Amino acid sequence: MKGFAMLSIGKVGWIEKEKPAPGPFDAIVRPLAVAPCTSDIHTVFEGAIGERHNMILGHEAVGEVVEVGSEVKDFKPGDRVVVPAITPDWRTSEVQRGYHQHSGGMLAGWKFSNVKDGVFGEFFHVNDADMNLAHLPKEIPLEAAVMIPDMMTTGFHGAELADIELGATVAVLGIGPVGLMAVAGAKLRGAGRIIAVGSRPVCVDAAKYYGATDIVNYKDGPIESQIMNLTEGKGVDAAIIAGGNADIMATAVKIVKPGGTIANVNYFGEGEVLPVPRLEWGCGMAHKTIKGGLCPGGRLRMERLIDLVFYKRVDPSKLVTHVFRGFDNIEKAFMLMKDKPKDLIKPVVILA
């Protein structure tokens, strides 16, 4: 089969591999729609998770089941499914501790384009199909559905980690597609004021659509100064980091009130340390909580997010600015994600 792959750090291209085979609890899926992610860019061009050779990329897909193992009960060939970016092994101690994202080791629930071939192939393997796949209602368009496996679950996880109370003031640092879903998640969880930090007009407009009450453009001056001015020196109850380099951690610590929460769902692809400013952290005693989490995966998570879309609580299709058709255009969409033109939020490739 054909696949678009990371050949080595800094190099991508098309390769041929054997079609995968399912184990007894697994499924083989043909992608119907895929989307490249900034994480793929970090992995390839920054070598963020180390060297990978001839690894098929991609972890955002909806697809059609083509084959299942003998023990799979709930899915059959022909079923349309949402495939989470995180597909844990559910029989691990990490799952029992409540951290399925790390089943088998830190970040080990993230398998696609990390420890095994991803979804940018003509077929791909899904472990533990009954626990990881979710049925896709026919009413949800593919462009919207393919935002569920990563963008929605990651952005919403930022809002979950932030412990948002009703009426709270929340800052979302970075309003790419993950940050926009963090804005939507903060609104759903009852935030009163949502301050979105970004500069590109297409993202600013989307942030307002999803619930941002204020916009801070980092090109207009230091983020912390602008947010402290907006809040009359009080700061925010929670800051969700959804973009930026390592220095954004210091910004988040500076703008959060004592007792507030910094929630990170950003993939830091470079740098050895994340700075925490001593004074703004109250010399270590400000009761400011820093959390970072890999997005939840698995069937139940996908089913709940599907319900949010199906019942029109959230419309993730607003993230999609570029739609390509045909398998060979995966490379074009991938490079678009790397180059990030001003009119881009998220590209999608339709394969159905």
From Swiss-Prot:
The keyword Heme does not apply. Zn(2+) binds at residues 37, 59, 150. Its cofactor is Zn(2+). Homotetramer. It catalyses: propan-2-ol + NADP(+) = acetone + NADPH + H(+). The gene is adh. Belongs to the zinc-containing alcohol dehydrogenase family. CDD domains: NADP_ADH (cd08285). Binds 1 zinc ion per subunit. Alcohol dehydrogenase with a preference for medium chain secondary alcohols, such as 2-butanol and isopropanol. Has very low activity with primary alcohols, such as ethanol. Under physiological conditions, the enzyme reduces aldehydes and 2-ketones to produce secondary alcohols. Is also active with acetaldehyde and propionaldehyde. PANTHER family: NADP-DEPENDENT ISOPROPANOL DEHYDROGENASE, ZINC-TYPE ALCOHOL DEHYDROGENASE-LIKE. The keyword Oxidoreductase applies. It is an enzyme of class 1 (oxidoreductase). Gene3D superfamilies: Medium-chain alcohol dehydrogenases, catalytic domain, NAD(P)-binding Rossmann-like Domain. This is NADP-dependent isopropanol dehydrogenase. One of its GO terms (molecular function) is isopropanol dehydrogenase (NADP+) activity.
